[in-house]
């Protein structure tokens, strides 16, 4: 993962309305193993975060100036340190206007992954811990806590440059439960939501369920294809990459690589060719399975509490909306 430029600034602020004090670094960080490890760990932590949103820049204006400064940097009108300096000064101003905001170290990193250029911006905090030194004494130790990553964004610079119609070249961490704590950071990035990741993922899973039903697949084949979808989508989220419908279709059915893709297009589900899969929604699609004494049961996890009710005390399942094929067999048996 080549790192083109990287710099860290510090904004000292407590969430009590006190002024935000900026401690800006003048020069970029030099290349080192520590920087590479930091970026790798940051990417892993960011990709694993649930509840991210995707979007695109507001039009450049005084309220949303970051995209203009970023364009100046990419066109070599500003160097990276100068770009990060005006950006962090703007963030400092927004922090002062938000009483709930807390300061920290602000990381700006321009790096390349494959053939794609990204800009990562993250607010990092320290955690207190302990370490054992060379004299075998236990001493206090501070470290960057990437497990508590709450404010961060990643801009796909290549997508922004090459696809003017894209509405998902920015991803950012949303506040939990609709909290407004992170609004100032989204305004700093100047991002408006363009793609509903959870909604798109639910639509994809609905399309897949409809496809499996229309194909009238045996239970084992349906289970294998479901696992293929979940594994592929989960891998893409870990990599920070979108789910590509054509690639997914070819994985689901190697003999008919366009079958699922054509099903989506013919039924007009309204899905984009690439969608940012939502990890939380994917986890709800995993299957529960079990066999015992001639009985085989398998259902998708998201049906629990809806079409499938579990009574733990009685040890029973109540299934609503039985498959038509099963109902017909039961009726014939009764007759």
Curated annotation (Swiss-Prot):
InterPro entries: Nucleoid_associated_NdpA. This is Nucleoid-associated protein PputW619_4243. The lineage of its organism: Bacteria, Pseudomonadati, Pseudomonadota, Gammaproteobacteria, Pseudomonadales. It comes from Pseudomonas putida (strain W619). Pfam families: NA37 (PF04245). The keyword Cytoplasm applies. Belongs to the YejK family. One of its GO terms (molecular function) is single-stranded RNA binding. It is found in: Cytoplasm, Nucleoid. Its main location: cytoplasm. HAMAP family: NdpA. GO terms for cellular component: bacterial nucleoid; cytoplasm.
């Amino acid at each position: 993962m080549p790192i083109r430029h990287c710099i860290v600034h510090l904004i000292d602020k407590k969430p009590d309305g006190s002024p935000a004090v900026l401690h800006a670094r003048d020069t970029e960080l030099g290349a080192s193993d520590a920087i590479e490890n930091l970026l790798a760990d940051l990417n892993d932590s960011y990709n694993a975060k649930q509840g991210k949103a995707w979007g695109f820049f507001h039009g450049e204006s005084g309220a949303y100036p970051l995209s203009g400064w970023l364009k100046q940097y990419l066109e070599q009108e500003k160097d990276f340190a100068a770009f990060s300096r005006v950006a962090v000064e703007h963030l400092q101003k927004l922090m002062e206007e938000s009483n709930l905001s807390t300061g920290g170290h602000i990381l700006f990193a321009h790096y390349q992954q494959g053939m794609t250029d990204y800009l990562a911006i993250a607010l990092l905090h320290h955690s207190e811990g302990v370490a054992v030194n060379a004299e075998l004494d236990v001493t206090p130790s501070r470290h960057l806590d990437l497990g508590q990553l709450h404010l961060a964004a990643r801009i796909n610079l290549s997508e922004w440059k090459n696809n003017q119609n894209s509405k998902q070249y920015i991803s950012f961490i949303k506040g939990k439960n609709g909290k407004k704590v992170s609004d100032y950071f989204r305004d700093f990035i100047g991002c408006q939501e363009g793609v509903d990741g959870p909604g798109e993922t639910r639509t994809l899973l609905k399309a897949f369920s409809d496809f499996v039903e229309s194909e009238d697949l045996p239970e084992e084949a349906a289970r294998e294809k479901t696992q293929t979808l979940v594994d592929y989508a989960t891998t893409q989220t870990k990599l920070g990459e979108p789910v590509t419908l054509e690639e997914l279709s070819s994985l689901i059915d190697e003999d008919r690589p366009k079958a699922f893709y054509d099903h989506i297009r013919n039924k007009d589900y309204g899905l984009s060719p690439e969608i940012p899969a939502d990890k939380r929604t994917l986890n709800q699609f995993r299957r529960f399975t079990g066999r015992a004494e001639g009985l085989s049961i398998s259902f998708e996890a998201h049906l629990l509490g809806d079409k499938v009710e579990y009574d733990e005390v009685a040890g029973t399942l109540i299934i609503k909306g039985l498959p038509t094929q099963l109902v017909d067999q039961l009726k014939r048996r009764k007759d």
